[in-house]
């Protein structure tokens, strides 16, 4: 009976390792009000996959555009792989194609064109052996909106702390 428990624990640990966060754009959640999210695939070359798995991706300045009916990821820096020669390495800031269903792309295109919203990369995560990018439909926050959101967050934190004390 003890062996079965060890196998289950090992399997759970393997699943947790297979589904992990590789990069997070925390700044985007501060600068934008995220209205909707979408998980997409991302077209990468081998050295980019190795660099992302090593945590060498920066989503902070990134944005997404819809061109020719395709989602494209711009200005996301993925560092060159250290153990590959310069000839085989990738361009760190190249435009990358995102993989999503046609109806999802059309839905986001309508929202971006109509309301003046923007598409922002939020996080890179590993799902099994696939690297997925979560993008968000965001509306830019003004300075007073950021302050109000920070104040609301702090008040929720205070209420939670007070509830735990009693």
From Swiss-Prot:
Give UniProt keywords alphabetically: Cytoplasm, RNA-binding
GO BP annotations, alphabetical order: trans-translation
Annotated protein name in UniProt: SsrA-binding protein
**CDD domains, sorted:** SmpB
Q: What is its main location?
A: cytoplasm
Give the family, as the similarity comment puts it. Belongs to the SmpB family.
Q: Origin organism of this chain?
A: Synechococcus sp. (strain CC9605)
Q: Report whether Cytoplasm shows up as a keyword of the record.
A: yes
Per the UniProt record, one Pfam family is SmpB
Which GO molecular function terms does the record list? RNA binding
Query: Could you tell me which residues belong to the region Disordered?
Result: 146-166
Q: State what this protein does.
A: Required for rescue of stalled ribosomes mediated by trans-translation. Binds to transfer-messenger RNA (tmRNA), required for stable association of tmRNA with ribosomes. tmRNA and SmpB together mimic tRNA shape, replacing the anticodon stem-loop with SmpB. tmRNA is encoded by the ssrA gene; the 2 termini fold to resemble tRNA(Ala) and it encodes a 'tag peptide', a short internal open reading frame. During trans-translation Ala-aminoacylated tmRNA acts like a tRNA, entering the A-site of stalled ribosomes, displacing the stalled mRNA.
Q: What is this organism's lineage? A: Bacteria, Bacillati, Cyanobacteriota, Cyanophyceae, Synechococcales
Could you tell me where this protein is found in the cell? Cytoplasm
Q: Which PROSITE patterns match?
A: SSRP
Coiled-coil segments, which residues?
Answer: none
A GO cellular component term found in this entry reads: cytosol
